[in-house]
Each structure stands twice: as structure tokens, then as C-alpha cells.
Amino acid sequence: MLTERGSWKFGADTLPWRLAKDKPAGARRAPGGTDTPEARRMAQGSMWPDNAQLAMSFVVNVEEGAEYSPREGDRHPEPVDELGIALKRPVRNLGNESSYLYGVHAGAPRVMALLERYGIRATFTAAAVALERAPELARAIVAGGHEVCAHGYRWIHQFSMDEAAEREFIRKAAASIETTTGQRPYGWLSRYLFTEHTRRLLIEEGFTYHMDDYSDDVPFWDVVDGRAIVVVPYALDSNDMKMWTAPALTPEQWLAYAIETFQVLYEEGATRPRMMSLGVHLRIIGRPGRIRAFQRFVQHVRSQPRVWIATRREIAERWAAANPRRLA
């Protein structure tokens, strides 16, 4: 896989994105738009609509009901929970299952109401089965004008799948989401780990952007077997999942970190394109003790004059239009 990124500067020196020793032997830069007038304008910071300094992406993960469970034939229950209890036996963790369902029953109404109140159009990264089992939520997402991005058929790992199984997993997710929501998903987010085939399969199945990357603050092209896809990097450091994986992290600390991230990127965006991703979960941020931290972050974003709040598909399309690839 060959990647293309817009040029960037740090101080007066132009630096490479990666060290020469990290480049695979025999690799060459794929022909692209890094020398076009559009790319030069992008590098000067005029990439986003209305001269915005920052593209802000809100990502709401919908995984509830699609997680691991012996009920679904899995060998173990879901290992990710608020208490850090990971059972190794093939028995259902009914307590954790109910904790996940909280996201649908109580968390979702809070999150949806907050997004509506502040006029936020988000990207909902949804495991297809989760939406199948929560049709009212699926309808609310569509009615709110949000984007639905595929987050797997179920919220399970795909890194151990062979190519045929992974292709079927991707196809089933896309077909299910389109049936449930009426929207064909154009983006994909794996359950963290993916395979060397994933990006090629996504291209072949008609996806236009991929989120499984954490290497930059702007999108970039990846080229696989001569075909291109936009990579829209995600972020884990500001994700509300940190309040589950690090239970001592308070909502106030999470909020402070998120705001600091926003401020640095917003200031950098005055001279170069920048994007911020904030990922949240219905069952986590939707809790009464956490929802106001999310609200305060949204209020902070809304208080800044030059922010473009957009779905990830909009960001991918805008970046691709401003930084077109040239075929060899």
C-alpha cells in the first residue's frame, strides 16, 4: 500500500512524514495531487469551507447488542466492560449485557437530544446488528441527518478472518445497514484490528473512506493495487472509552483533555489544515454523570468562529476534491 499526504511544515523546515528507514524497500510515492494548486492551497490552510481553521468530526459508536456473547455462538462473553471483568468461560455475562443495553435504552436519547440541541451532524459508526436490534435508534439517526458508517457486521474482531470471510463480513455489514437505515455506508471502522486485505476489500466493495488509522491530523490517500481510497484518521486518546479502560479518569479530566486537543488543533489550523475526531459511545458518554462533560465540549466547539462541523464522509469528499489524485 502506498500513501499520499499533503505537504506540511514545522517551523521553517519541511520534514518527511516518516523516516527513510521506515519506507518499505522499493516503494515509490504514488502519483497524486501533492503538487497541484489545490494541494498547495490546502497546505496553506484554506482547505475547509468558509475558510474554517478546523474540521470537527463527532463520531458516535453504536455497538450495543452486537458485542461478543455465547448467545451468538462465541467462545467467551464480551471482554470490554466498565469494571474490567473479562470472563474466559463460555458463559453469558448478563450484567455486562445489560450495561451495554443501557446505551440503547437511556444513553441514546441523551446523546441524540444533545446533538439536536446544538445542531450537530455526527457520524454514527454502527455495527450492523446493533441497528438491526434497535430500529427506533436507526430511524432517529437518519431523521437527525447523521451519517451511518459501517463498524462491522457485529462488534467483533476481523483480524483473524481469512480473505473470503472478511469480504463476506464487509458485505453483510453494508447490506444490513442499507436495509435498516436506507443509507449505503461509504466508510468503515473495524474493531481496532484489521488485516492486510481490509483496505483492498473495502475499495472493491465500493467504500470511499477508511477510518482504521491513527497516524495524522488530516486525511490522506492510500493506493492499493492501483486503486485509491481516502483514509480519514481516527483518534483514541480523546475517546470516551478511556473512562472505561482507565476508570480513574473522571469526566472533568476527559473534558479538559478534549478541549486542550481542540485548542491546539484549532490554533494550528490557522496556517495548515487540521481535523479533530472525538469518539463517544452511547453506553459511556450517555451516562448521567458524563453527558454534561460532552455538552460542555460541544459548547466550547460552538463558541469558536472558524470550525466546520462535518460528517466523516463530507470530510473525505472535501479532502479528495481539494487534493485530487493524478493517474499514472
Which role fits each region the language model picked out?
Residues 237-239, 280-283:
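Active-site clefts of carbohydrate-active enzymes
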